[in-house]
Amino acid sequence: MATVQADSKITIVGSGLIGQFWAMIFAGGGFKVTIFDIYPEQISKALENIKATLSRYESQGCLRGSLSASEQAALVTGCNELKKCLDGASYVQECVPESVDLKRKVFEQMDPFITEDMVVATSSSCICVSQFVGNLSHKHRTLVAHPVNPPYFIPLVEIVPGPWTLPDVTAKCRALMELVGQSPVTLSREVAGFALNRIQYSIINECWNMYKDGLLSAEDIDKVMTDGLGPRYAFIGPLETMHLNADGIVDYCNRYAQGAYNVCTTFKPPPIMYDVPTAEKMLQEIKKAIPVDKVQERRTWRDERLAALAALKRNLKEKTD
């Protein structure tokens, strides 16, 4: 299987926040990165933000890779000519907003410049690649590589091949993600919402129903995750939890399957629509702790703690390796 070499060029299509994170991740791995945007001023803004963010991460001790912040920033350049950006690239990560029509337009523009040794991934969080590449001549070089926000501190990447994606393209994408320190999972085929959002939406569905039924306050619902499931799931997943909570997963099923089934029969059938009246009621509770005009401050708080958790997990892994 061919791999993306360390001296390869990587192109990011879209200069928004996710595109900037991808650029920093690849630069941290020592790759030369080119960011494409049709607006030069957006490119300049992105490059300035990347430089400042890398410098801040370095001062906070959470910079990834062996290169300094200035060395990593020097690896990232910008260009507003698509053909020039794609020329010589081994890997392309599209990061435009979540719109089928927009993604179709962008991929149609890229198609003439895609080569047979190039991997072209979309950062789509729910839209399958087959929904917008079906008419492309290079659709077999495309797939989903969905990051989790913020991807610099949450390493999971969902790799979802389309029905035409060549196996080597999928394998090459996964190898690259591992090389730059991400944690890829590969789905065998397309499914709506991929893996993470199918699990996440299942959780939100039940949280929404419990709140509407008056079972718990918004604060207590979040506490169930932050002080209950969350700490455990930060280190072991639900299947390993089953395995450890009995004498193996088979023993867990023998002991608890009927009880779990009985609980599940009380669930309201999905899907549900997250309705505005319920959201407005939730907001009255949530904004007491986090006013809407303080959301950005809370995001910064979140990222700082995710960075600390990432460092902790990395240190623990190094001790056990």
Feature names for model-found ranges:
Residues 2-8, 29-31, 179-188, 213-321:
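NAD(P)-dependent Rossmann-like dehydrogenase/reductase catalytic/cofactor-binding core
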Residues 33, 92, 120-121, 142:
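Hydrophobic/aromatic residues located in beta-strands of well-ordered beta-sheets
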Residues 35, 78, 122:
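Conserved SAM-binding loop
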Residues 121-189, 193, 197:
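Rossmann-fold dinucleotide-binding core
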